[in-house]
C-alpha cells in the first residue's frame, strides 16, 4: 500500500465559499429585542455563531434572562432561554460557538441589562451550477487516480522490506502486593 495520497482525493468534493463577519448586539431596557434577518431572495445560508453573552458596565445586580427564537429542523419557530446572568455570580457566559440559522431573534425577558451578545456571522454560498460541474471533474480525476494506483501496487512490495516491524509495548509484570489488615 502506498503512503502517498493525492491532495484531490484527500480533500473530497470542493467546499462551498464561506465568508465570516463579526456579529454583536446589545439588549437593554430601551432595546429589549434584536432580530437578525436576511434577505429571502438570498440563496446563501446565514449562520449566527455565538461565542459570549455578557453584562455591560452599569448593569444592576439582578437576573438578566436572554432567550432566543429561531427555526428548528422542521422550520418551526422555537423559543428557548439562552442565558441567565447576574452581576454578583455570573456576569458572562461562554456558549462555545452556538450556531443558529437565520432568522434569529434575541430577547431580554428579565432584567434591564445592558447585555452584550457577540460572535460570528457566517455566510455559506450555494452555487449549484459550480457544484455540478465540479462533481464531473472529480469523477474524471478519480478515474485517473484509479489508473495510477495500478502502477503503484508493484512498488508496494519493495517498501515492506525497508520498514522495520514495530512490536507493541507490553506492561511490566510486577508482583501484586497484598494489604495486611490488623484488627
From Swiss-Prot:
Keywords (alphabetical) are: Nucleus
Alphabetical list of Gene3D superfamilies matching this protein: Nucleoplasmin core domain
Task: Extract one GO cellular component term from the record.
Answer: cytoplasm
Where does the record place Acidic residues bias?
Answer: 126-166
Say if the entry is tagged with keyword Nucleus: yes
Question: Where does the source fall among the domains of life?
Answer: Eukaryota
Region of interest (Disordered), residue spans:
126-183
| Compartments reported by the entry | Nucleus, Nucleolus
Q: Does the keyword Nucleus apply?
A: yes
- Pfam families according to UniProt: Nucleoplasmin
Q: Which GO terms describe its molecular function?
A: chromatin binding; histone binding; RNA binding
In the record, biological process GO terms are: chromatin remodeling
Q: Which family does it belong to?
A: Belongs to the nucleoplasmin family.
Q: What is this protein called?
A: Nucleoplasmin-like protein NO29
Amino acid at each position: 500500500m502506498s503512503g502517498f495520497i493525492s491532495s484531490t482525493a484527500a480533500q473530497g468534493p470542493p467546499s462551498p465559499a464561506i465568508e465570516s463577519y463579526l456579529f454583536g448586539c446589545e439588549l437593554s431596557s430601551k432595546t429589549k429585542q434584536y432580530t437578525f434577518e436576511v434577505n429571502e431572495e438570498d440563496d446563501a445560508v446565514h449562520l449566527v455563531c455565538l461565542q459570549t453573552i455578557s453584562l455591560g458596565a452599569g448593569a444592576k445586580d439582578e437576573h438578566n434572562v436572554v432567550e432566543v427564537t429561531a427555526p428548528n429542523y422542521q422550520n418551526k419557530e422555537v423559543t428557548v432561554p439562552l442565558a441567565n446572568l447576574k452581576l454578583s455570580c455570573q456576569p458572562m457566559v461562554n456558549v462555545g460557538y452556538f450556531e443558529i440559522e437565520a432568522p434569529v431573534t434575541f430577547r431580554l425577558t428579565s432584567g434591564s441589562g445592558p447585555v452584550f451578545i457577540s460572535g460570528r456571522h457566517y455566510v455559506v454560498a450555494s452555487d449549484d451550477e459550480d457544484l455540478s460541474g465540479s462533481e464531473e471533474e472529480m469523477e474524471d480525476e478519480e478515474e485517473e487516480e484509479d489508473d495510477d494506483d495500478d502502477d503503484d501496487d508493484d512498488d508496494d512490495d519493495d517498501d515492506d522490506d525497508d520498514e522495520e516491524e514495530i512490536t507493541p509495548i507490553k506492561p511490566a509484570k510486577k508482583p501484586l502486593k497484598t494489604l495486611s489488615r490488623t484488627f
